[in-house]
């Protein structure tokens, strides 16, 4: 390997250099090709991996499980009701127990401080599957997907906008990733929902070194002009109360990704991205409740955009598995 990431935690992109992030993306692409070609080599044979989920998941759980199985590892799923973490046992103690039994641990849950403590005391690689502050494995998948749909452009040549709630874990992580990779990112949404000022300042300092550009704006037309990709996420994140919907929908409605917004990019080949799940119609319980209450079929993105040729959301979802596999192989593989 060009970089030795063995035994490293993967907790947030701030911990990794530009070259290390690019290495993980390149490794993801190689592993994806090998899986499709049937030439994959098992680098995790004999490894045991714990998957701690304090929040529900579809893509992240499936991606970790399939990636581990492909590479020859065994997994144990520990769900929200399947452990004593934080109730009868501290994370510090849990980390030291699981670290004696497992070769690697994934955590998906709440505060970043929790996964940082797990990483500090486990003694084995710990991977962040999502916290309230950061979602680093998602961003690796996003950047691999962008490269696959950029006609040979490097990441540093890509312009993209994130619309909506830019202070959530995906908005934060996209900003960090873009800064690290020297990209042009525009965070487009109400100022009250921009990322924390300290994180913005840290990313601006990184971007100054890498040649990246970070723009925060409430102006949709200004934010999306010339973009190669438009990205959005749900307006109310996991763990937030249903009461948050009324205020949030009123604030975020101008930042819905619809065909008019795509046209404002001036790029007929612009692509649409979303980390999923998405509220793009009324075919889910929550989607129907929203449609009935607000008269909107689709919130952060319209059905027309989601199902259009511009949408690459399922390529993006698949790439969760390839990039997670790369993280595990790089940090734990033989």
UniProtKB/Swiss-Prot annotation:
L-ornithine binds at residues 169, 233, 237-238. GO terms for molecular function: amino acid binding; ornithine carbamoyltransferase activity. Keywords: Amino-acid biosynthesis, Arginine biosynthesis, Cytoplasm, Transferase. It is found in: Cytoplasm. It holds the Pfam family OTCace_N. Transmembrane segments: none annotated. It is an enzyme of class 2 (transferase). Carbamoyl phosphate binds at residues 57-60, 84, 108, 135-138, 275-276, 320. One of its GO terms (cellular component) is cytoplasm. Gene3D superfamilies: Aspartate/ornithine carbamoyltransferase. It catalyses: carbamoyl phosphate + L-ornithine = L-citrulline + phosphate + H(+). It comes from the Bacteria. Homotrimer. Belongs to the aspartate/ornithine carbamoyltransferase superfamily. OTCase family. NCBIfam families: orni_carb_tr, PRK04284.1. This is Ornithine carbamoyltransferase.
């Amino acid at each position: 390997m060009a970089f030795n990431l063995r035994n490293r935690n993967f907790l947030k992109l701030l911990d990794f250099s530009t070259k290390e992030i690019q290495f993980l993306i390149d490794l993801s692409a190689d592993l994806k090709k090998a899986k499709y070609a049937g030439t994959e080599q098992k680098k995790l044979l004999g490894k045991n991996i714990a998957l701690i989920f304090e929040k529900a998941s579809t893509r992240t759980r499936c991606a970790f499980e399939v990636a581990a199985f492909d590479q020859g590892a065994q997994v144990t799923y520990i769900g929200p009701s399947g452990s004593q973490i934080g109730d009868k046992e501290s994370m510090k103690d849990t980390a030291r127990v699981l670290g004696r039994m497992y070769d690697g641990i994934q955590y998906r849950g709440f505060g970043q401080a929790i996964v940082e403590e797990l990483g500090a005391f486990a003694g084995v690689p710990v991977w962040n599957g999502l916290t309230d502050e950061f979602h680093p494995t998602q961003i690796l998948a996003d950047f691999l997907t962008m490269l696959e749909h950029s006609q040979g452009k490097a990441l540093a040549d890509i312009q993209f906008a994130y619309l909506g709630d830019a202070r959530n874990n995906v908005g934060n992580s996209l900003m960090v990733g873009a800064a690290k990779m020297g990209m042009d990112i525009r965070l487009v949404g109400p100022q009250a929902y921009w990322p924390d000022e300290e994180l913005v300042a840290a990313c601006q300092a990184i971007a100054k070194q890498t040649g990246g550009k970070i723009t925060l704006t409430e102006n949709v037309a200004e934010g999306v002009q010339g973009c190669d990709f438009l990205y959005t996420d749900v307006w109310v994140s996991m763990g937030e109360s249903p009461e948050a919907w009324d205020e949030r929908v009123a604030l975020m409605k101008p930042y819905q990704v619809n065909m008019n917004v795509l046209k404002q990019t001036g790029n007929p080949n612009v692509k649409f991205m979303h980390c999923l799940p998405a509220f793009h119609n009324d075919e889910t319980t929550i989607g129907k409740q929203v449609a009935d209450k607000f008269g909107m079929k689709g919130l952060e993105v319209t059905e027309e955009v989601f199902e259009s040729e511009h949408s690459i959301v399922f390529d993006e979802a698949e790439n969760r598995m390839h990039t997670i596999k790369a993280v595990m192989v790089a940090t734990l593989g033989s």
